[in-house]
């Protein structure tokens, strides 16, 4: 009986935590799961998959996608 009550309280707590930490207040769980499914279908959309460009490689001036330093058509390391 005590274990059942503890399980019910744990499930209610986790559900409330999920709603409280959701990004969009209107579509809390729906929005969370749709973003996750989109990232699974398109791994390039994942924030963890962002690639950076090594030094002396061509880069994008607008996005500044160099690992270290700055992008001036090629990634260059700027001494501090």
UniProtKB/Swiss-Prot annotation:
<dbReference type="GO" id="GO:0090729">
    <property type="term" value="F:toxin activity"/>
</dbReference>
<keyword id="KW-1015">Disulfide bond</keyword>
<dbReference type="InterPro" id="IPR004214">
    <property type="entry name" value="Conotoxin"/>
</dbReference>
<dbReference type="GO" id="GO:0005576">
    <property type="term" value="C:extracellular region"/>
</dbReference>
<keyword id="KW-0732">Signal</keyword>
<feature type="signal peptide">
    <location>
        <begin position="1"/>
        <end position="22"/>
    </location>
</feature>
<keyword id="KW-0960">Knottin</keyword>
<keyword id="KW-0800">Toxin</keyword>
<feature type="disulfide bond">
    <location>
        <begin position="66"/>
        <end position="75"/>
    </location>
</feature>
<keyword id="KW-0964">Secreted</keyword>
<keyword id="KW-0528">Neurotoxin</keyword>
<protein>
    <recommendedName>
        <fullName>Conotoxin PnMKLT1-0121</fullName>
    </recommendedName>
</protein>
<dbReference type="Pfam" id="PF02950">
    <property type="entry name" value="Conotoxin"/>
</dbReference>
<comment type="similarity">
    <text>Belongs to the conotoxin O1 superfamily.</text>
</comment>
<dbReference type="GO" id="GO:0008200">
    <property type="term" value="F:ion channel inhibitor activity"/>
</dbReference>
<feature type="disulfide bond">
    <location>
        <begin position="52"/>
        <end position="67"/>
    </location>
</feature>
<feature type="disulfide bond">
    <location>
        <begin position="59"/>
        <end position="71"/>
    </location>
</feature>
<keyword id="KW-0165">Cleavage on pair of basic residues</keyword>
<feature type="propeptide">
    <location>
        <begin position="23"/>
        <end position="49"/>
    </location>
</feature>
